[in-house]
Design a protein with these regions (language model features):
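Gram-negative and organellar
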Residues: 1-595
């Protein structure tokens, strides 16, 4: 594409065979389109179309260029060009008719695309190009069973070869080249395949069939994830593991049901025997000094997370429980819908999910003196996400609103807003490098970050803003896939004062009446400040056999007072692997608690 752009813009004369200004301008426009500079190509083609409004090749090239632009006005102009073309392209010109079908599809006029595909199938039922376009159109509309019928018919024709390749009569004796729907129309005026069968074409069709067949493969996944976060022993430290086992059962080609059974073991360590840290845990600060422990000092929990749900192209739902066997067990789940509105993609979600940052927030805990249980926090709310592409950039905006509740924990509210922009800065046959920026803003109604009775043990500043710069490299070589993602960030947060016991005026008054060794009061002081953070996520996956894949993932997060480390090893077994294409990045097993 760089060479095409250079040729289109340099002053070097074009070949003498392009004898007229029209031919030269058209050739330059095609070079610009080959370089993906569609706006410049459209600007060059518009005067040609105005000067020669009946020139079919110019109008087709202009429609092709406009259909690849994201501006709504350009899409409308492309639709106007397509409306003009549909009555003027000869019915027997299969190449141009298929080019028009791709334009309809690109600008979102799916009714016109389907109607044209139906007419072409009626007129050319033995043309593999027509069958392939119809198959891809059905696949785009998620009609996978019908797409398979067309793909298999095209494969049969290509495997035995064509007796007479279709041809198209084009202006200016334009050469015919193979169709590639991802390339500009100017470079693909026909899709004539060789006779006998072309192995590359047969392999491509077979790959598309295999990709659809992969949608209905049963599989099972299992993993072991080690958790580690060093902080105050017995209170905010967290060590342990989660062992997810997930069975995936296909629902035709449309999606998969799944069943999660995840064993979980968490350990915060031993509570301090005395001292200021102990006063900030449970009800200790409200009870007489020296009160004996009613529970063991070791703070830990074992349980099982269970979930059942469905993941399809545009619908996802699940229902389950977290922490069967923990001090607090919660019903969790979610429902989400994705789709497109013009050039925008959206996701709407309602959810109820666990907060897993500490033993207290995830499993709940028992007060060491009274034995009362508190914690086990869940976020119940709704979220929305809107995304689109702007030239080479992808951008998204998301908003999440939730109420946070737990057993004997004060109710809280949370608002999270995030904007992100990224683009691929390097592409190669083996992988891609993506660079971006993300701005996040959070607001909590209360700061319940502490571990005394009524707090939730989860980070909840009143206000938080951060700017992050993520860099990601992912790819595949042979049976090996990889992902490396690093990010640096700066943030600013602030919190107000918070009582030790926001849920209980009685406990708060008892704590105020108890003499404090340092003369202080049972109130957590407010604070504000800035910080610097960095994170890393790396994953490797290897396809050992067509049935079995093994992988590992490491996640690190580092900031002033937060430094968790997670490491996972996992495996995936496909019962009917066939020849499904490999993913271009690892797909680690997801624990149910992280949905």
């Amino acid at each position: 594409t760089n060479e095409a752009s250079r040729l289109a813009r340099q002053a070097t004369p074009l070949p003498d065979t392009l004898s007229t200004p029209r031919q030269r301008s058209l050739a330059q426009a095609r070079l610009l389109m080959a370089a993906a500079e569609y706006a410049d190509a459209a600007q060059l083609l518009k005067p040609l179309a105005s000067a020669q409004p009946e020139d079919l090749s110019v109008r087709m090239a202009l429609a092709d260029a406009l259909s690849r632009l994201l501006d709504t006005g350009d899409r409308r102009a492309a639709a106007n060009e397509a409306d003009w073309l549909k009555d003027r392209i000869p019915p027997s010109d299969v190449g141009q008719q298929l080019a028009l079908l791709r334009i309809w599809q690109r600008i979102g006029r799916m009714d016109e695309a389907r109607a044209l595909a139906t007419r072409l199938l009626d007129s050319f039922p033995q043309d593999s190009d027509v069958l392939l376009h119809a198959a891809r159109l059905e696949r785009a509309n998620r009609n996978y069973a019908q797409a398979m019928v067309f793909f298999r018919s095209a494969l049969m024709l290509e495997t035995r070869g064509k007796d007479t390749p279709p041809t198209a009569t084009l202006p200016d004796s334009q050469a015919q080249v193979p169709v590639d729907s991802d390339r500009p129309l100017a470079l693909q005026q026909s899709y004539t395949l060789s006779v006998p069968a072309d192995p590359a074409v047969v392999a491509k069709i077979q790959g598309e069939i295999d990709a659809i067949e992969a949608r209905r493969q049963p599989r099972i996944e299992a993993g072991h994830q080690a958790l580690s976060k060093r902080s105050t022993d017995g209170i905010s430290s967290l060590h342990g593991w989660e062992r997810p086992v997930v069975a995936w059962m296909p629902r035709g080609y449309d999606g998969h049901y799944f069943l999660h059974v995840d064993r979980v073991q968490l350990d915060a360590g031993d509570l301090p025997a005395n001292g200021p840290d102990l006063l900030t845990y449970g009800q200790v600060a409200a009870l007489p000094p020296g009160s004996p422990f009613a529970t063991e000092r070791r703070q830990r929990g074992q349980g099982t997370n269970l979930g059942f749900g469905y993941i399809g192209d545009d619908i996802q739902w699940d229902i389950g429980t977290t922490g069967v066997g923990f001090p607090v067990t919660n019903v969790v789940g979610g429902l989400s819908k994705t789709g497109d509105i013009g050039r925008y993609s959206y996701k709407l979600e309602a959810y109820r999910r666990p907060i897993t940052g500490s033993l207290l927030s995830y499993a709940g805990a028992r007060d060491p003196i009274t034995g009362q249980v508190w914690g086990g926090v869940v976020a119940t709310g709704a979220a929305g996400r809107l995304s689109t592409d702007i030239g080479p950039y992808s951008t998204s905006l998301s908003l999440s609103l939730a109420a946070l509740t737990g057993k004997n924990v004060a109710t809280n509210t949370r608002m999270q807003l995030r904007w992100a922009l990224d683009r691929d800065v390097w592409r190669h046959a083996d992988g891609v490098v993506n660079l971006g920026v993300a701005v996040s803003a959070w607001r909590y109604g209360k700061d319940l970050s502490e571990y005394s009775f009524g707090h939730g043990g989860y980070y909840s500043p009143r206000n938080y803003v951060s700017v992050a710069l993520p860099l990601e490299w992912s790819g595949r070589r042979g049976a090996l896939t990889w992902l490396a993602r690093g990010s640096v960030s700066v943030s600013r947060s602030s919190s107000g004062e918070s009582d030790y016991f926001p849920q209980s005026p009685l406990l708060q008054s008892l704590a105020r009446a108890r003499p404090a060794p340092d003369g202080g009061v049972p109130v957590y002081a407010g604070s504000s400040g800035s910080g610097f953070g960095r994170s890393f996520r790396g994953a490797l996956e290897y396809q050992v056999t067509p049935h079995l894949a093994l992988g590992a993932q490491l996640e690190l997060d580092r900031s002033a007072y937060y430094a968790p480390t997670n490491f996972m090893v996992y495996g995936r077994y496909r019962f009917e692997p066939g020849n499904a294409p490999l993913d271009n990045r690892p797909r680690p097993v997801q624990t149910y608690s992280s949905f």
